[in-house]
Amino acid sequence: GVRRFLKERSVGFATEYGVVPTVAGAVIFDLGINKDGPTPDAALGMEACLQAHAGPVAQGCVGAGCGATIGKLYGLRQATKGGLGSSFIHTERNVRVGALVVVNPFGDVVDPRSGRILAGCRESPESRRFVHTAQAMARLERLRGFSGNGNTVLAAVATNVRLNKTDLTKVAQMAHDGLARL
């Protein structure tokens, strides 16, 4: 759907034979939550393109964020709902940078300033208190329901600054480091 949308609008890599739309794709593993929900297909890709607009985007339990969860140390029943988030900055020098992130990690989401857990594995399915995942793992607690699969955090960073391949690589590294920061 996305490729067709771009091709119909002649957006892509120009060749002597015509424009070749280049589309990257990524998904989160959310079958434990979203097993009966829609799976990405051409129709959904086209619909996403048609719904795109300038300005703030919907956040939370939308799009790829629908099946996202946080803190899966003791399985999905004790995980917290994840989702889609975004941020944007426009500087005085007309530099624009935006980030769109689908938060679906195994571990906790921690406030870097206070160290407080914002979302993660709960002490019980009904609890509002969080287990500190890293500490629990260090104590070698039994990993009830643990699976190494299904823990994907996706991030896209965009800017209006012209960057060469080396600069793009550096931006990608910084974005990745930002995800891993404790």
Question: What would you call each of these model-derived segments?
Answer:
Residues G1:
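Glycine-rich, N-terminal phosphate-binding loop and its surrounding beta-alpha-beta segment
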